[in-house]
Amino acid sequence: TRALAVPGFSEFPTEHLSDLAFVCFTMYDATFNLPIAFPPRAHRNVLAEVWARVCVQNFRLAETEKYAHVTYFFNGGVEKEHACEKRLLVPSPKVATYDLLPEMSAFKVTDKVLRTIDEGETDVLVVNFANPDMVGHTGKLDKTIEACQYVDTCLGWITKRMREARGITLITADHGNAEQMIDPITGSPHTAHTINPVPLHLIDEGSVGMKLRSGGALEDIAPTMLALLGLEKPEDMTGRDLRELE
């Protein structure tokens, strides 16, 4: 982009193209000062902002590979911590590819989660397990199965401790990967994300007769979490509370 359209480029000789109309697909670099087909949009009243306004004590935990997902991305593209927000980064293991260590740092993350539950000082924990996605990217089916088994074990411990603490657990994902390890057309290893529907599990021992509505979408998770906390969703949120209460 710089060589073709940014004045002052000097890394190597270039030819000025007077009849070139250069449009960036997205904003790759703000210093380019070029037209953008799909400029970034500001996200208003995301879940983290609502929590901050009423001081919901929330704790974000993940290992290195997914730390940005529970902080920067969860906050709508904002790096700075909000009020009443705590963060903990657990280092990912130093290996060439994660099929060499499918457990990654899942057990270390889980230890921190269990300790936080026992302390009882946090309203919401946001946790991301990297294993199914990061090991899934290697295309190694047997190691991806191991990765899922490790996370299943960790979720079992967390869910048990949450039930003992009379808390509510939501388990979901923002995309697929590990569920499709073989390309159905070529038969080759499938290493990319998928757009398959993802599961949503809501474990709440205190809700008798509660069911989840059909046809849910990712946009419904934030309104559901706010409803579980007894908070109103802002108008900017287009999703709905997924619970059906009898």
Which residue stretches match the model-derived regions?
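Feature captures the catalytic ectodomains and active-site-proximal regions of enzymes
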Residues: 1-246
